[in-house]
Amino acid sequence: AADIRDALRRDATWFQRLRKADAAVKEFVLHLVKPKPEERFTNCVPLIPLKVAAGNFGEPQTVGDGEWDYDWVEINTHRHLRKGMFVAQVVGKSMEPMIPDGAYCLFCSQVEGTRQSRTVVVLLRDTTDPETGQRFTVKRYESEKAVSADGTWRHIKVLLKPVNKDFNPIELTCEDEGSVEVVAEMLEVLG
């Protein structure tokens, strides 16, 4: 701890960099557009009015299949846009500094392949956070699996891990199977 304090005293620019990162999130402006159906997912995606909770669970909502009745936003990304992608705001501090509180992120509801070590949106169906009553969370997905004699596997434990060390992971066991759903993968922090 003393080494960290000494390093911070020698280099005070860390505070200025932190303030610039916070300002970047606050200055980010969404560009709402009204695309024709054939223009959707070319340079714009739907803005889901879901404030995904990075510290707790969000309001019970569902992510659709791309037929959105929401606002559309133009985004600047190197990614090839496709149906199932959307922008949502992440609130909470558990994923800082990777995802700043209040940041808008690009997500894809089609999570393909392994989820291991990916940042995902998870819905807990059968439970809510006792303090907030919310259901969605954004966390890094880690799982332990067991393989049976017939070659099939099952989850022994899933950890939904925050980036911020001030927060604890959410641990799910095989008893929680069926009550948890990965609904999207976080692709990019937009601002």
Regions found by a protein language model. Name each.
Residues 22-73, 189:
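Extended boundary segments
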Residues 77-191:
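Acidic/glycine-rich C-terminal interaction modules and beta/coil loop segments
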Residues 1-35:
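Helix-turn-helix-like N-terminal two-helix hairpins of bacterial/phage DNA-binding regulators
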Residues 2, 74-76:
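Generic structural signal for alpha-helix starts
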Residues 18, 61, 116-117:
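Short amphipathic alpha-helical leader/targeting segments
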Residues 11, 22, 69-74, 168-176:
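General structural signal for secondary-structure boundaries
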